[in-house]
Swiss-Prot record:
Changing residue 134 to M: In transposon Tn3411. It comes from the Bacteria. This is Citrate utilization protein B. One of its GO terms (biological process) is citrate metabolic process. One of its GO terms (molecular function) is 4 iron, 4 sulfur cluster binding.
Length: 379
């Protein structure tokens, strides 16, 4: 009787998307045909019931690869209408919104397209006006690529450093809350290593058989995994370029501009190329993906994030090409505006998915090694 009462109480507190994931997982747990596709299904088999914490954990463990959708005998148009990618995607959006900091800003996830647009317009206007205010004009004689003659170094360091740290801090505050609810135990070094390997290699975008995901149909492709790698490692190379340039400036006394074949410029150039190839490929795949695959309402968030990354790299490469011309001020203001828009939307856009997924991968590494000892905080 107590067990029945517990199930009734949990059913009342589940949202509609969470209740759908619970229904889908109950069917999948009875079938288990997809058990070898990814981490979601082995994690599912360790449960007979699916509470709120379990559902949010499994939803963020899902990589939206689509293999289970095309393999499922109960997928639409079957009357069971089992669509794991769609159900999981809808819960992921609720996860981001629920754990957003401050809480009121969680609503921005549901208007992600508008959020990205407003952030971009605001940032572009801000830096164009700053450039005009500091130099009196957007056009100027060539400055030999010296950005700091347009915007002082300390101003840029303060603006971008504070916004980036605040954005990451707000995002991490939500991820920590999420972690505490899905995992009552902390990780061990071996579990951290396994989760890191799975995240960095995107292991679960291989479809479980190494041939890749499904996109427009039931054909397998590794393109999504590869474009994700171009995007992630391109971003990390750009970040490394910033770190090296910061070290040059503060510790070695070497001030920008740096030659083309210097370490910061080469890292930034290679990263920029990765951030063109990767996002362009992901956008192409997003446009051709099956309508049954994922949550169509989230396409503005997905595409807005991809376009911001693409604009960041394109404007950065354009700035490098035009840094010795009288157009450098305009190019610099546009590039900085795009980067600022990206930073502003970090805690309220698609950027968050990587953090929540890594937390879920870590939970799975713990669970796989320790079984029921890993538990769920809500149990």
């Amino acid at each position: 009787m107590k067990q029945l009462e517990k199930l009734i109480i949990e059913a009342k507190i589940l949202t509609e998307p969470e209740a759908e994931v619970e229904r889908v997982m109950q069917v999948c747990n009875a079938c288990r045909y997809c058990e070898g596709f990814c981490a979601v299904f082995p994690a599912m088999t360790q449960r007979l019931e699916f509470g709120k914490a379990d559902i949010n954990y499994l939803a963020n463990l899902c990589h939206n690869c689509g293999a289970c959708l095309h393999a499922c005998q109960y997928a639409p148009p079957h009357e069971f209408a089992i669509n794991v990618p769609k159900a999981m995607a809808e819960v992921r959006l609720e996860t981001y919104q629920h754990y957003a900091q401050p809480a009121a800003f969680g609503a921005l996830y549901r208007q992600a397209g508008v959020t990205v647009t407003l952030a971009l317009v605001f940032s572009l206007i801000l830096f164009l006006l700053l450039a005009m205010g500091l130099k009196g004009s957007l056009l100027h004689p060539p400055l030999a690529g010296d950005f700091y003659q347009i915007f002082p170094h300390n101003l840029l360091a303060w603006m971008f450093g504070s916004v980036f740290m605040l954005a990451i801090g707000l995002l991490m505050a939500g991820v920590i809350r999420f972690w505490r609810e899905i995992s009552p135990v902390g990780p061990r070094p071996a579990e951290i290593a396994e989760a890191s390997h799975n995240a960095l290699t995107l292991k679960y975008l291989d479809g479980g058989h190494g041939k890749g995901c499904n996109e427009a149909d039931d054909a397998f492709t590794l393109m999504r995994r590869r474009f994700h790698h171009f995007t992630f490692y391109g971003f990390m190379l750009c970040f490394a370029a910033t770190v090296v340039a910061t070290g040059y400036h503060y510790f070695a006394g070497w001030e920008a501009p740096y030659p083309f074949f210097s370490v910061p410029v080469m890292l930034g150039t290679l990263g920029g190329i990765g951030l063109i190839v990767g996002p362009a490929g992901l956008l192409w795949l997003n446009l051709k993906r099956s309508s049954l695959h994922g949550d169509a309402r989230q396409k503005p968030m997905d595409r807005g994030f991809i376009l911001l990354l693409l604009l960041t790299s394109l404007t950065g490469i354009g700035l490098l090409a035009g840094r010795d011309t009288s157009w450098m001020g305009i190019l610099l203001a546009i590039h900085l505006g795009v980067v600022m828009a990206l930073f502003l939307t970090i805690p309220y856009g698609k950027f968050a998915h990587g953090f929540y997924r890594c937390a879920s991968l870590l939970k799975w590494a713990i669970e796989k090694r320790r079984g029921k000892q890993a538990g769920v905080a809500g149990d």
